[in-house]
Amino acid sequence: GTQVQLRKSRIGFTRIQSVFISHLHGDHCFGLMGLISTFGMLGRTSPLHVYAPGELGPMLKAQMEMFCQGLEYEVVFHAVDTTKCQVVYEDKSLTVSSIPLDHRIACCGYLFREKPTLPHIKRDMIDFYHIPICYINNIKNGADWTTEEGDVIPNARLTTPAEKARAYAYCSDTAPFPELSTWV
């Protein structure tokens, strides 16, 4: 299913850096080995990070030893504690947190949050006030500009607001419970 959907969506397999698995029921994890194998056949060389309940670790290791010898890339397993909210992945633009879910077995959802970006510079104002490039980052970070004549140009005149950061919560296979709405 996963590989078919990726192909239908025209998402390049090489763009996938991480896989997040909520729990160890077959419809959520059986496709992982096929995906790993396909990545290998396509010549992947960059690491693939797998975030999942800790119980997957030994099974993944055994299956990798059995079916995926000779891969040209590393599969890095990250055990996720399904009992608490915690940051499991972070880079310069994204944070992924686990969300405990109420299911028959250990299960968590994932909250994907973009980090806020800086405001956009109004190029026409930069040109108009002859602001040197070396000051652009200060302005993006909220600084006003003082002209050679001593006039202070407010930051709001030099920038436009950044787009609002987006978030997506993946919460499947759970019974409703009150705390869930406060986490997402």
Question: What would you call each of these model-derived segments?
Answer:
Residues R44-D81:
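Active-site neighborhood of divalent metal-dependent phosphoester bond hydrolases
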Residues I11-T14, Y73, K92-L94:
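Structured loop/turn residues at beta-strand edges in well-structured enzyme cores
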Residues R10, G40, F67, Q86-V88, ...:
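Short secondary-structure boundary/capping segments
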Residues D81-V184:
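Metal-dependent phosphodiesterase/nuclease catalytic metal-binding core
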Residues G1, L24, E55, M125, ...:
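Active-site metal-binding loops of divalent metal-dependent hydrolases
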Residues L6, L32, L60-Q63, L180:
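Hydrophobic packing residues within well-ordered alpha-helices of enzyme cores
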Residues K8-S9, T38, Q63-M66, W183:
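A generic secondary-structure signal
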Residues T2-Y51, A79:
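Active-site metal-binding motif and surrounding structural segment of the metallo-beta-lactamase
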